[in-house]
Curated annotation (Swiss-Prot):
Organism of provenance: Rickettsia prowazekii (strain Madrid E)
Bilayer topology: Multi-pass membrane protein
Protein name: ADP,ATP carrier protein 4
One GO biological process term: nucleobase-containing compound transport
Matches recorded under PANTHER family: ADP,ATP CARRIER PROTEIN 1, PTHR31187
One GO location term (cellular component): plasma membrane
Coiled-coil segments: none
Length: 512
């Protein structure tokens, strides 16, 4: 039997070809792009790690040291106006400073505040805040302003919450993505961005794992250096020290990207410019009212924001029954973040196959279905803790309150994971068959109105209830929130079904 050398050569070339395709699929980064990709990834990792640490810390401080009910007030009356203010400031900075210097300035302001909070403000918060007797007298004389008084009396905690909430919008969404979008070509983005998504979830998982082990780290540092500071003060200082270190690494990485990694071609693209034809709130409403397709997409965004916030408030309030200190609460949030990272990676890997095999509607309806089913389970146990919680607890031999917290955590993990993948991808797909003008302005309109109304609408609704009923708590209004939640989810599923019809019609129309 003779062996043909040309056949062997062809076989090897086919194997090499298949192996090359597999390698390109797993690692699509070209050799000359590796340094650029790795530095951008490092910058993204640092920013997201900080984001997840301060997100957990702000909730830990506010829920355990002021009250979970105040979060809705902070979101509507604190975060929203601050976001508008910083947008105005940013626009003015863009017209007066270099893009690189804007990044350094804004990051430095955030890091300076975090350093002051860790080493000056929090260790002395009892001296800086109003005395409990004064707060009690004020709330007794002005009961309808109770929650505003509590927030102002513990002003440093409120300020920390607002600053921490601004980080993802200002540093990640604005500074990071505007920089990356400017230095990345369209061809590069197709290969870079999917990997960014996977790596960002790795950051969530690691941040969560760090917070889970915060108590152990605290004990180690205390024993190693014979520190005398309070346990919870040290926990906050450990978290914010990591934040400061990663912040400095971010600044250095950004400097290296600008001065060592990027070539002149990429640097020529790097300009932060404000668009003269930015869409206003009034124009957004006009666009939504004129197009049913865009109106339905905006409805999905509004319903998501309302539904998630309606569950998060009572869930965080329930968690404070078990996790009563900032350290304990941060460890609990860390566990939740770890699972969110794992499940999001799972949905990322599964998402494209679901869309391809089962179609747009099935993929789009998964998120509202998950939110609805898990949300109803949470409210059922939370509202009827003595009945439903006791039945479940008898089977799994645990505290009924812990059952509600666990179901709430599962609800949040699955909801956020499916939102980051299936919901976001199907929402973006819904724009594709539209005419170019509607696609561009319609997306801006839906994102502006849908996102803002979803987040702020739920916060305003909850804060209004607490103003009218100052003695109310999340536990006492939970049934009311459950009814609103059910109506919101039903509307969400209906809007998804109707958008599916519009989506199919738009595809048919675009193919004519």
């Amino acid at each position: 039997m003779t062996i043909n050398a040309s056949n062997i050569e062809n076989s090897f070339s086919k194997i090499n070809s298949h192996f090359s395709k597999l390698t390109d699929y797993i690692w699509p980064i070209k050799r000359h792009e590796i340094s650029k990709f790795l530095f951008i990834t490092l910058l993204m990792f640092c920013i997201l790690f900080i984001q997840n640490l301060i997100r957990a810390l702000k909730d830990s401080i506010v829920t355990t040291m002021i009250g979970a009910e105040t979060i809705s007030f902070l979101k509507f009356w604190g975060v929203m106006p601050s976001a508008f203010l910083i947008t105005v400031i940013y626009v003015k900075l863009v017209n007066r400073m270099k893009a690189e210097n804007i990044f350094y300035l804004i990051i430095s302001i955030f890091l300076t505040f975090f350093a002051l909070f860790a080493y000056v403000i929090f260790p002395n918060h009892e001296m800086l805040h109003l005395r409990p007797v004064t707060v009690h007298n004020l709330t007794a004389s002005l009961p309808n302003l109770k929650w505003f008084i509590l927030l102002l009396s513990k002003w440093s905690f409120s300020l920390f919450y607002i600053i921490a909430e601004l980080w993802p919008n200002v540093v990640f969404a604005l500074l990071f993505w505007q920089f990356v979008n400017n230095i990345t070509t369209v061809e590069e983005s197709k290969r870079f961005y999917p990997l960014f998504g996977l790596l960002s979830q790795t950051g969530i998982y690691l941040a969560g794992h760090f917070l889970e082990n915060l108590s152990n780290i605290n004990y180690y540092v205390t024993n190693k250096f014979a520190l005398q500071s309070s346990f919870h003060t040290l926990s906050i200082q450990i978290i914010l020290t990591i934040v400061l270190i990663l912040g400095i690494v971010s600044i250095k990485t950004f400097w290296l990207l600008n001065h060592k990694v990027l070539d002149k071609k990429h640097m020529a693209l790097l300009r932060f410019k404000t668009k003269n034809k930015s869409i206003t709130i009034a124009k957004s409403f006009q666009m939504i009212l004129s197009s049913r397709h865009i109106r339905l997409i905006a409805t999905l965004l509004i319903c998501y924001g309302i539904a998630i916030n309606l569950v998060e408030g009572p869930w965080k309030a329930a968690a404070t029954k078990i996790y009563k200190t900032p350290t304990e609460y941060a460890a609990f949030i860390g566990s939740y973040l770890s699972y969110t990272g794992v499940f999001t990676i799972f949905f990322v890997l599964l998402g494209s196959n679901i869309v391809r095999r089962m179609g747009w509607f099935t993929s789009a309806v998964i998120t509202p279905s998950i939110v609805f089913i898990t949300g109803i389970l949470f409210f059922a146990v939370n509202n009827f803790e003595g009945f439903a919680g006791l039945i479940i607890a008898n089977f799994i031999l645990t505290d009924p309150a812990l059952v509600a917290i666990t179901i709430g955590a599962i609800q949040n993990v699955l909801s956020k994971s499916s939102k980051y993948t299936l919901f976001d991808s199907t929402k973006e797909m819904a724009y594709v068959p539209l005419e170019p003008e509607i696609k561009i302005s319609g997306k801006a309109a839906a994102d502006v109105i849908g996102t803002k109304l979803g987040k702020s609408g739920s916060a305003f609704l909850q804060s209004l209830i607490f103003i009218i009923l100052p003695s109310a708590s999340y536990q006492s209004i939970s049934i009311c929130l459950m009814i609103i939640f059910i109506l919101t989810c039903v509307t969400w599923i209906w809007a998804t079904k109707e958008l599916n019809k519009e989506y199919k019609n738009s595809i048919k129309f675009s193919q004519k």
